[in-house]
């Protein structure tokens, strides 16, 4: 009798020439994107009373939310990428020293269309020219990048489309969220920032001017106040159609990081990638006022080619200059978006065999002299660019990503930040684990700015200083190594009630690469090296997620009351009208009789 593995190997492939030709039976591609920790999970359900090692701190009462791209169906293209998976939200509810797990897919328009068809219908990542004709005009977002609690709802976000609202307790999808009809752009960031002092949410969108797939250079920035009312909106032009994944906010300014990974409409129409890395293009930083802005108020700063990671902190000095901290890698992090064939990298860049991702500090003067230029992508629009190029004022060799801070200190000088860290000097069991899916994030790091690098409200200096400068350190480092068979996903800081900055806990998902399962680990945020105080064991393998947040349950409970039928605000109002680009497309179809 043949062994089951022999039978499986003899099955006819579902893909011919990279294209899905046989939707059933369900079989996913045999590629690294769908292997190891990235094998599809597709779990929906609840698991109560999870096994725990150690002691969950008694003062933790809330939910750790995170989201993962998780293809519901085998993709249309065999070489599909991780970022194209359907958003699945995980909620780990913690109370009274116990933990429970709930997970559900975000019921986006895309998800619902494919669920009814019983197969994938949407093609390459952010490329509608590769979709099945039956879904033309459907919002393509998979809502798989971040989940943010806002005014009683959980917003599942991906920067290629509008957010979708979910119930924070049941994870039921309520519908597309347009801020009660106030924001109707085709795209919306996955990284809004909330000002803890004012309660305002500052948010933005790129490729915002058309249908979200036309490679426009339009950038919009909005502010929504704590009462849910849009109070600021301004539109700008970027120098080229590229990715603006994250931002920072200070008390008076917004900083947008434009990465030299470029869109090209003709490439997309040929069935190619949405993005291509351009090793000859600068990295750019756009600085705009938070209040009363006009389109010409933007100032773009240029620096040498590099790839932006995520923002740690952003604040202002007494001089009015802006401090902006984020990780910046020295090459293309998104290897699945290589340069176009006609692009020749500068000498040295093509020979890099590994990337470094330090934490860099930039200081921008919003009053710097600037000039209007014209670019090929912006066409006849003015792009306001600083006359002088910029360089980081310091580079801390953390080699990490997914920076997080105590968000009570958003817009303010901050002392502490945390990252998932790559340390290639630590042992790794390749025989047991294979290639580390998602990157070798084998450590968690806690970093504390010291000396002049921590700016108090009275600081007047902006130079780089502090112990350890000679070896690329600008403060204290507290690092925990996972072991030779494990890696971490993004950490999240949980503040201790009434505690000083950085006092609290750090929570993260731990990947057991040799066992293909996950744990949730909880640390004392200022003593990572001592190891976790509690480990919550999950009885299944999740996927590599992207971002998440902790929400205190007092906030959820209070908003549930306000959002009830007899509450002072009432139930969440989800979008009732199609987006403007959808209306326009419907009109065009009517005119042509399609």
Swiss-Prot record:
Q: Which GO terms describe its biological process?
A: carotene catabolic process
Keywords associated with the record: Dioxygenase, Iron, Metal-binding, Oxidoreductase
- State the Gene Ontology terms under molecular function: carotenoid dioxygenase activity; metal ion binding
Specify which residues bind Fe cation according to the UniProt entry for this protein: 191, 245, 310, 547
Keyword Acyltransferase part of the UniProt annotation: no
Where do the annotations place piceatannol binding? 125, 158, 401
EC annotation from Swiss-Prot or TrEMBL: 1.13.11.-
What is the free-text note on the cofactor? Binds 1 Fe(2+) ion per subunit.
Q: Does the keyword Metal-binding apply?
A: yes
According to its UniProt record, which reaction does this protein catalyse? trans-resveratrol + O2 = 3,5-dihydroxybenzaldehyde + 4-hydroxybenzaldehyde; piceatannol + O2 = 3,5-dihydroxybenzaldehyde + 3,4-dihydroxybenzaldehyde
Cofactors named for this entry? Fe(2+)
For binding trans-resveratrol, which residues are annotated in this chain's numbering?
A: 125, 158, 401
Pfam families to which the protein is assigned, alphabetical: RPE65 (PF03055)
- Family assignment from sequence similarity: Belongs to the carotenoid oxygenase family.
Task of the protein: Dioxygenase that cleaves the interphenyl C-alpha-C-beta double bond of resveratrol to yield 3,5-dihydroxybenzaldehyde and 4-hydroxybenzaldehyde. Also cleaves piceatannol, a compound that differs from resveratrol only in the occurrence of an additional hydroxyl group, which leads to the production of 3,4-dihydroxybenzaldehyde and 3,5-hydroxybenzaldehyde.
- Spell out the protein name for this chain: Resveratrol cleavage oxygenase 1
Q: What is the protein's species of origin?
A: Chaetomium globosum (strain ATCC 6205 / CBS 148.51 / DSM 1962 / NBRC 6347 / NRRL 1970)
**Which gene is transcribed and translated to give this protein?**
rco1
């Amino acid at each position: 009798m043949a062994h089951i593995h022999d039978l499986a190997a003899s099955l006819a492939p579902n893909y011919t020439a990279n294209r899905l030709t046989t939707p059933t039976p369900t079989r996913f591609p045999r590629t690294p994107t769908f292997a190891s920790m990235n094998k599809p999970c597709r779990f929906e359900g609840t698991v109560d009373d999870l096994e725990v090692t150690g002691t969950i701190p008694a003062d933790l009462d809330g939910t750790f939310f995170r989201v993962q791209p998780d293809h519901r169906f085998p993709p249309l293209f065999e070489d599909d990428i991780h970022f194209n998976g359907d958003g699945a939200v995980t909620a780990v509810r913690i109370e009274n020293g116990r933990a429970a797990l709930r997970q559900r897919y975000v019921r986006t328009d895309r998800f619902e269309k494919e669920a009814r068809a019983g197969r994938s219908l949407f093609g390459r990542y952010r490329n509608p020219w590769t979709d099945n004709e039956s879904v033309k005009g459907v919002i393509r977002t998979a809502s798989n990048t971040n989940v943010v609690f806002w005014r009683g709802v959980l917003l599942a976000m991906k920067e290629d489309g509008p957010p979708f609202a979910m119930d924070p307790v049941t994870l039921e999808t309520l519908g597309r969220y347009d801020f009660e009809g106030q924001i109707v752009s085709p795209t919306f960031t996955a990284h809004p920032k909330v000002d803890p002092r004012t309660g305002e949410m500052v948010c933005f969108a790129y490729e915002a001017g058309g249908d979200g797939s036309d490679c426009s250079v339009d950038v919009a920035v909005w502010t929504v106040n704590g009462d849910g009312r849009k109070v600021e909106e301004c539109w700008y032009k970027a120098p080229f159609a590229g990715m603006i994944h994250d931002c920072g906010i200070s008390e008076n300014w917004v900083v947008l990081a434009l990465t030299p990974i470029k869109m090209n409409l003709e490439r997309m129409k040929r069935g190619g990638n949405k993005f291509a890395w351009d090793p000859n293009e600068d990295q750019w930083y756009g600085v705009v006022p938070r209040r009363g802005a006009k389109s010409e108020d933007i100032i773009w700063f240029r620096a040498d080619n590099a790839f932006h990671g995520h923002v740690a902190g952003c604040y202002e000095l007494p001089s009015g200059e802006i401090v902006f901290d984020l990780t910046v890698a020295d090459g293309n992090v998104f290897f699945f978006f290589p340069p176009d064939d006609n692009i020749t990298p500068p000498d040295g860049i093509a020979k890099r065999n590994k990337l470094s991702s330090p934490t860099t500090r930039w200081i921008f003067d919003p009053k710097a002299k600037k000039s209007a230029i014209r670019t090929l992508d912006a066409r006849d629009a003015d792009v306001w660019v600083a006359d002088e190029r910029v360089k980081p004022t310091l580079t801390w060799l953390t080699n990490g990503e997914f920076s997080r801070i105590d968000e009570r200190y958003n817009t303010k000088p901050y002392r502490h930040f945390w990252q998932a860290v790559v340390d290639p000097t630590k042992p790794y069991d390749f025989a047991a684990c294979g290639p580390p899916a998602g990157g070798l994030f084998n450590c968690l790091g806690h970093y504390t700015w010291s000396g002049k690098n921590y700016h108090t409200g009275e600081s007047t200096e902006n130079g780089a200083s502090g112990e350890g400068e000679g070896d690329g350190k600008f403060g204290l480092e507290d690092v925990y190594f996972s072991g030779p068979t494990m890696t971490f996903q993004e950490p999240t800081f949980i503040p201790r009630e009434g505690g000083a900055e950085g006092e609290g806990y750090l929570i993260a998902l731990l990947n057991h690469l040799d066992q293909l399962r996950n744990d949730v680990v909880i640390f004392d945020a200022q003593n990572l090296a001592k190891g976790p105080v509690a480990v919550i064991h999950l009885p299944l393998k999740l996927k590599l997620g992207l971002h998440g947040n902790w929400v205190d349950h007092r906030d959820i409970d209070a908003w549930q009351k306000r959002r009830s039928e007899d509450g002072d605000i009432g139930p969440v109002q989800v979008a009732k009208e199609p987006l403007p680009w959808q209306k326009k497309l419907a009109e065009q179809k009517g005119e042509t009789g399609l």
